[in-house]
Structures are given as structure tokens and as C-alpha cells.
């Protein structure tokens, strides 16, 4: 079986409406919308694949989408980015996912209001299974647990590394731990480690997660506060690049795509983190999850300026 360096993603994809507001309103309050941009797609795995493709990686998505206008727009975004969607199935009568995102212009923070799809689980046909089995890495986000677990099982049986964006959590914590254990590359958000392990500190929780399964990478992203990385059995803090963030929507998703791109190219852990942090920082300079994703040349120029 020929193995490629392709990043195959199974996870959430949606269409975002980015609303920049004067200030985030209190409950039962109001605020003015300064601008609306509904041209960009979103979703953790989806945006990671777009970022990787923009950086030159070979990428493909396995997903279900509704046979609706929203699904058309989501697919158009992938086509523009160069992400293969040959294994995306359109579901007649299905509703594709969309999301309203409020952005605070003072600090670039975002609050999401997802409108979930009503789509059935993915049917992992022979074609889809083969795509995973030949991948350089499988990237998951766990939003749809059944889809993520099925894909992870296919990858593990074929010896394909599993990358998990550990941000979504199931109510049954045993399910979270099962998926986390299957991940070879585990990159969490700031909340996930303590939430699923019950450990008192983030560092202790990350070490516990790193000990589950056969981890090659265990990281926690902290936004402007950098990254925690397990290195030789100890937690190391790696600072972020300082930028004036316009919008942090998709910053973590982009980090994943950039990290996997660098990792599949054979770079060491610190180089992968530094590259991903640079790409993520540049993304934050423009509104939306994708408009600010840099090209490889732009990312390398930024790194050269901050060496």
C-alpha cells in the first residue's frame, strides 16, 4: 500500500458569519454590529485543512454536507483553497452547519453560536477507508464522536498517525479519554486537559494525557500565552509571537494545520511549534478564520523577522 504525506481530515465544517461588534453585550443587553462577513468557512478540521493547503500540503476531507446552499458555499471554500473534497457526500434534505461569530474589536476575542447540522454518521466506504489508510496523518476534532472514533480505528489499524484537536468534549468523559488515548498527536485547548482528567493543574493534566496510548506529541495551546509542550517527560512553556490581534477566530484550527504540515515535513517538535505559532499569529491580523492564513513565503518571512 502506497503511503502519502497527505493530511486527511474527518471533522466539523461549517459556514461562518463573522460579526464585529462595538463591545460584547451583557445578558438582556444589546450592542451595534460594525461589520458582517459571511464569506468564510469554518470548523476545526476544515480550517486546519485549509491552512495546511495554503502552506503547500496535500489535503483531503471526508465529511457529509447537506444538499443545500450552505453546503455549496462550504464546498466552494475548499475548492478555492485546494482541499480535495472527492470524499464529501451530499445528503439530500440535509442541513449543513453554520455559525454566528461575535468578535470584540478591543482584543480580538470571539464568541461562537453554532447552528449544528442534522446529518447522519459518515458511511466509511472502501474509497474513504483507503484514503485514510494511505494518509500521512489523519486529523480529527471529535465534534461528531461517532465519525471521529470510526476514522481513528481505521487509521490505527493501518498504522497511520492520528492527530486530535482536543477542543470538543462529550458528556460521557470515558468517551473523551478513549479518543484522547488513540491520538498520536494530541493538541488541546486550554480547558480540555483539566476538564477530562480532573487534575489540579494544567501541567499535571497534560502529562497525564501524554501518558495515554503512544503519544508522539502532546501540547496545549494557550492563545497569546503560548504553548505547553511535553518534552522528555516534562512540561515546557513556549511563548507565543506578540501581534495586535484583530480576530482570534480559527487561530487554534490554523495552528493544527500548520503544525501537521511542518511535522509531516520531518521538522523537530520545537520547529513545528514555532512555525505553527507564527502562522496562527499572522491569521489573527485579519477578521475571520481563514482570510488571514498566510502563504508559506509570508510565514517564513515572519519567522525570519523574529529569529
Question: Over which residues does each language-model region extend?
Answer:
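Glycine-rich phosphate/adenosyl-contacting loop at the front of the ribokinase-like
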Residues: 1-64, 69-76, 80, 244-245
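Conserved phosphate-binding/catalytic region of the ribokinase-like
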Residues: 1-8, 33, 202-307
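A glycine-rich helix N-cap at a beta->alpha junction
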Residues: 79-93
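Conserved phosphate-binding/catalytic loop of the ribokinase/pfkB sugar-kinase fold
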Residues: 90-91, 101-137, 142
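Active-site glycine-rich loop that binds ribose-phosphate moieties when present
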Residues: 119-127, 146-147, 165-174
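Conserved phosphate/ATP/ADP-binding segment of small-molecule kinases
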Residues: 154-163, 168-237
